Amino acid sequence: MASFPVVTLKTNLADYPVTLAMKDGRVTSSLVKLDYCGPKVANKGFKDMVRQNAYDAGELAIITYIQARAWGKPFVMLPAPVSGRFQHHCIGFNHELGPLAPKDIEGREVGVRTYSQTTGVWVRGILQHEYGVNLDKVTWRTLEDAHVTELQDPPNCKRLPAGSKLADMMMSGELAAAILGGDMPKDPRVQSLVPDPAAAAQAWYEREQLIPINHVFVVRQELSKQQPEVVREIYRMIVESRGFAPESTTRPPFGLEANRKGLQLAIDWSFEQKVIPRRLSVDELFDDTTAALGA
């Protein structure tokens, strides 16, 4: 059996249940060393990854990755989502200011950190397709630009002044609602814009049979082309690490075909919301090496 020198890769990866055994040393490799040199909060490294190629491997938000692929950035994904969740609960409003149904945000201002944020794309898609919201009639107020510099936000997207706090503006009524995800205030006045979001998410899952992907693992395209054995080894490590994680009902599966429907939906909603210049195919998200992983 041929032996290969150990390859060290600059890696940006957070501590997820599926990656923790890689991070804490329970899963190792004689072929590849992952140098976890990214920021403590991994998403703070996404801009550097797609703009400056700051890392060789690691996680990217799925919408950031789809954009990166659409604009020819040198990364390719493994069919290994490292996180996923239902998104119905991720948009809220202050119910003390009056009732608000999903359609009521038309003609109003809604806050989101960036227009192309993965949570924002999933939530807007749910609002459009499940509740009939015309997204073009909403003014989206943002704090930051996209991770990918090529994206031009649509005309109904306006930047807030520096230092603005979405949660505070939602609570005061300056914003009708805000997409905040895990940063939603733990305040009894906050109510989900989607009624009974847990039940809505369960009904959606029973119908669609997919869990929205949040972050995926990617590697440099050059690595996949020149050293496919290293990429296969990384996938093996992720699979082994995932085996240490407790069972979860909100974890996307591994493998291209198992994720095809979810990836297609992410592409479709990205295109509908004008965060990518064209509708990619699912197969364009992979190369020959990564498409075969888990097959």
Predicted feature locations:
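Immediate post-signal peptide segment of exported/extracytoplasmic ligand-binding proteins
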Residues: 1-10, 99-109, 272, 277-280
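Internal, conserved structured core segments that host functional sites
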Residues: 111-132, 142-155, 161-162, 167-180
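Secondary-structure boundary elements
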Residues: 98-103, 129-137, 168-174, 226
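Secondary-structure end/capping motifs
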Residues: 218, 223-277
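Tryptophan-rich aromatic "cage" segments
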Residues: 268-295
